[in-house]
């Protein structure tokens, strides 16, 4: 079981490191289309302070986890003063007898004005194999990688040796 946990963490970290250079997932691969859909949807939500879109993004991601087979009681959207947090538990079999691991990311971005950008900051644009838009790297890419990774592992029937907890803040 240690090997599968190590493999999961290694692959997740590898994806995050490689994706910081260029996000060019083959959308024809299994889960590639779903990952791209989540990425595009999240970049195109203006989750800046005062825009009240973080709760919308949290609810969208919660619905993806529900569709992906995560029990409703393990998915929590916590709305607080115009923003939100999302907490998702991936239940393990406790074969490792260890405490849960928390994986965190943030759903919000610093606001951007259209006139300050060459492109609309809240429209995902691909040019020459690179994606442009507010949050494409920090941190909607990481959030998408974790989300898509959990969805894929769940679909493949993988059960972690301990609980894994997603904690996305707004």
Residue map of PLM features:
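Basic/polar N-terminal segments that are highly enriched at the extreme N-terminus
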Residues: 1-2, 21-30
